[in-house]
């Protein structure tokens, strides 16, 4: 709650399917507790070191154990660089903006590349990684890290355990962040943090059902005045429902005909 980190930014940008901007806001102002540690989060954290060591080994990089390193560790001259877990970084002008990347890699030319490691489930792999895409909430996390750390070159390392029996389960995305994207993200996140400080709900373009439940958990059954915009939306909703109903009826008829044909072979 003491600022904005990389894992918050996907929600703030409306790109995180697991956390909306409304939920993130409610967590930041203390209205709801932060998410509890689950098995996916626990094992994702455990596997960071394992995958990090493998990435370093594959790229002739010295892996430095230990966490929250303040200065670049020494490493053997036979290696092309050193990989280590940096301490938490904060923006020099805005202390609320912080980043805790998984690793840095510094090469012999003193150039630093940020490394972020993700354990990838089968669903996310099929939807994004298998197509060469980056999950958008993870991309925004990297964008945020690039702004806070002033490092523009990043490698997103994915590890998909379900692939390990038939192929290399580790794969990478090389990312360089452009200034326009950084500015767009910064403006949105700064606006969100200002809302948190003032305890004013950020503007929501398309509230979800979960957002409504968070904001209005109980119905007071009070009457609220309408307006032309809401009247228009109500008419549109009626039109949509009128179109859906005959399609649902047709769907049911077709399903039953197919099941009837299949007989006992059907489900």
Residue spans of the language-model regions?
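Accessory terminal regions of nucleic-acid processing enzymes
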Residues: 1-267
């Amino acid at each position: 709650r003491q600022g904005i980190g990389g894992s918050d930014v996907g929600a703030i940008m409306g790109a995180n399917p697991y956390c909306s901007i409304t939920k993130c806001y409610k967590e930041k102002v203390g209205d709801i507790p932060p998410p509890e540690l689950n098995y996916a989060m626990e094992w994702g954290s455990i596997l960071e070191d394992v995958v990090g060591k493998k990435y370093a080994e594959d790229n002739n990089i010295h892996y430095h154990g230990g966490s929250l390193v303040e200065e670049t560790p020494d490493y053997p001259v036979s290696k092309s660089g050193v990989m280590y877990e940096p301490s938490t970084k904060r923006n020099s002008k805005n202390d609320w903006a912080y980043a805790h990347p998984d690793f840095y890699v510094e090469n012999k030319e003193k150039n630093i590349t940020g490394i972020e490691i993700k354990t990838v489930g089968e669903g996310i792999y099929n939807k994004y990684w298998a197509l060469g895409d980056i999950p958008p909430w993870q991309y925004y996390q990297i964008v945020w890290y690039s702004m806070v750390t002033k490092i523009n070159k990043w490698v997103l390392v994915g590890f998909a355990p379900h692939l390990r029996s038939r192929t290399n389960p580790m794969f990478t995305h090389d990312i360089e962040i452009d200034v326009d994207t950084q500015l767009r993200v910064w403006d949105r996140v700064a606006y969100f943090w200002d809302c948190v400080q003032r305890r004013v709900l950020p503007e929501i373009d398309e509230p979800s059902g979960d957002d409504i439940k968070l904001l209005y958990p109980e119905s007071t059954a009070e009457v609220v005045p309408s307006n032309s915009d809401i009247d228009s939306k109500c008419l549109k909703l009626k039109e949509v429902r009128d179109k859906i109903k005959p399609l649902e009826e047709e769907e049911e008829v077709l399903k039953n005909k197919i099941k009837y044909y299949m007989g006992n072979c059907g489900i």
